[in-house]
């Protein structure tokens, strides 16, 4: 078998090079033609940075090539320093926004549990006023006397639903509240098993404001998600918007399917 010729390099008119080489594989000689174009990339850095790169290394890195060596150098997190003339004002605005958000989260209605004051609750006429006691607390929570909690003052435990002043879950008020929740609740299927309530709130539902309730259906035996989640929004309008945007959307390598938790009645034309 003849010897392999030396590689040839041909300069092209467009600035590229054609490299012709030969190789022997499985007893056969092959000709390999490669077209190579050299590109020079110029990096613009600060003058002082360029000077520091030329400093001579010492100690364990004496005589080493430029650049950090992972065996002797530990790289830290890269931080961006934003020097703005009005940085104090920006920090004050961020602090005010954070304080306002924390205040909104603290406010909770005692009637429906919404993020508003009890006196402004839109459901107070439907759900009724909470019974008042001498301490001004709900007897179901434990602010009343023993007769309100135990029924006879004997000290026996009485479930909250059977205590004095508690509302019957089968009453019209509870049914109305349940229907209102269903009207603004959507059902998500084909949800990734790794997505729990916090992941859904943080990475999927954040554009829709505060989410009152997220529930992921899990297998009671294994504790793993069944790929189904129920999401309750603040209003029915927001729920309708979320339904439109989440239907067919990709999330964690799965295509979501969104529908109402309770089918809507068809409007008569």
Swiss-Prot record:
Keywords assigned by UniProt? Answer: Cytoplasm, Initiation factor, Phosphoprotein, Protein biosynthesis, RNA-binding
Phosphoserine: residues carrying this PTM? 161
Q: Where are the stretches annotated Disordered?
A: 140-181
Q: Where in the cell is it found?
A: Cytoplasm
- According to its record, what are the GO cellular component terms? eukaryotic 43S preinitiation complex; eukaryotic 48S preinitiation complex; eukaryotic translation initiation factor 3 complex
Superkingdom per UniProt: Eukaryota
Pfam families in the cross-refs: eIF3g, RRM_1
Question: Does the record bear RNA-binding in its keywords?
Answer: yes
**UniProt KW RNA-binding keyword:** yes
Q: Extract the InterPro entries matched here.
A: eIF3_g, eIF3g_N, eIF3G_RRM, Nucleotide-bd_a/b_plait_sf, RBD_domain_sf, RRM_dom
List this protein's GO terms for biological process.
Answer: formation of cytoplasmic translation initiation complex
What family is this protein classified in?
Belongs to the eIF-3 subunit G family.
Q: Which PANTHER family does the annotation name?
A: EUKARYOTIC TRANSLATION INITIATION FACTOR 3 SUBUNIT G
Q: What is this protein called?
A: Eukaryotic translation initiation factor 3 subunit G
